[in-house]
Amino acid sequence: MELNVKTLEGKDAGKVSLSDEIFGLDPRQDILARMVRWQLAKKQQGTHKTKNRSEVSRTGAKMYKQKGTGRARHHSARAPQFRGGGKAHGPVVRSHAHDLPKKVRALALRHALSAKLKAEELIIVDQLVASEAKTKALLGSFASLGLTNALVIGGAELDGNFKLAAQNIPNVDVLPVQGINVYDILRRGKLVLSKAAVEALEERFK
């Protein structure tokens, strides 16, 4: 399929041919959901921790004698039922990451790209280059493209001026093509790809 190419100023710059195997799939929500869950689980810190009965700072002595008091039998005050005691089955430091096959991850990226094209939220620009690192000038360019919430994907190397100008714009993320991922694609409204990014993606999935 073919899609119009725009300049940063919003003018026409020809057409580009997109592979149906990457941009023409029927998006599957289950695959996208699995991928987002995998990304967020991998990102989660997992530093949560509570002290159990062997870790709390408290005497380990028996509270009172076993028999003769008429009260319930107890050992130390570290037990979970007492105030200041250890937590029973509390959270521990661990990794929340889980496995997801590499083929499923690759498929999810293609489905995310297809979903953006199907929703008419994909914009192809000829190049992501700024003459100077001025946020105001880049905001004007984005306004001409109708961008207020977007993920912008450039080639393997980002233009320094463009990167600096864009990093102060709210709700706009800029990544090189090797950093493209399903979660960032879905969390932003529009997806902007440079022609270099399209070529790199088609080479990657060849």
Swiss-Prot record:
The UniProt keywords, alphabetically, are: Ribonucleoprotein, Ribosomal protein, RNA-binding, rRNA-binding
Record keyword Ribonucleoprotein present: yes
Q: Where do the record's region annotations for Disordered lie?
A: 42-93
Pfam entry (one): Ribosomal_L4
- Annotated InterPro entries: Ribosomal_uL4, Ribosomal_uL4-like, Ribosomal_uL4_dom_sf
Function noted in UniProt: One of the primary rRNA binding proteins, this protein initially binds near the 5'-end of the 23S rRNA. It is important during the early stages of 50S assembly. It makes multiple contacts with different domains of the 23S rRNA in the assembled 50S subunit and ribosome.
Q: Which HAMAP family does the UniProt record give?
A: Ribosomal_uL4_B
Q: How does it assemble?
A: Part of the 50S ribosomal subunit.
Q: What is this protein called?
A: Large ribosomal subunit protein uL4
Organism, scientific name: Agrobacterium fabrum (strain C58 / ATCC 33970) (Agrobacterium tumefaciens (strain C58))
Gene behind this protein: rplD
